[in-house]
Amino acid sequence: IRKSVFAFNLPSVDLINYEADDLIATYVNQILKIGAKVTIVSSDKDLMQLYKKNVRIYDPMKNKFISQEDIDKKFGVKPEKIIDVQALAGDSSDNVPGVPGIGVKTAAELINYYGDLETLLKNAKKIKQNKRRETLIENKQKAIISKKLVTLKKDVPVKVPYSDFIPKHIDKKKLYNFLRDM
């Protein structure tokens, strides 16, 4: 991937202690502030929390743009509530503990009813199902930590300005050699 970035004369950015998702979220935030539109090319579900007006996501594995309907099917909530669902359901592939026994479907029902994780946790004592109520109360800190883990950072101290990502003159020979060697 890095070779392809250089072949197209684009910058490659990495920063110690930050994940690529956080760098992407930071650049998306900066670009939206100037009123431009953003297209993210990734199949990473964690980036779906960035989906909104002027931000679209293209999934190269599925060869399609992600829609609001796709997000509803996957998470059962609007994009801005994805982090609340992920905080409850957890994600073993990202080492997010979540709340034991709560999956995406139940998490979506709870978030759609209570609005967000914080309101749900404040009202956990009112939940009628004994086991669910007790599990949420016992695992409150896990849920709070999980939300911090899944929330993308949008203020990473990046040194490469977003303007460097505007396509520039492409060295045709360098690009040709890259494509030939693939």
Language model: regions and residue ranges:
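Long, highly charged low-complexity segments
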Residues: 173-182
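Extended two-metal-dependent nuclease catalytic cores across DNA- and RNA-processing enzymes
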Residues: 1-159
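Short, contiguous strand/loop micro-motifs
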Residues: 162-163
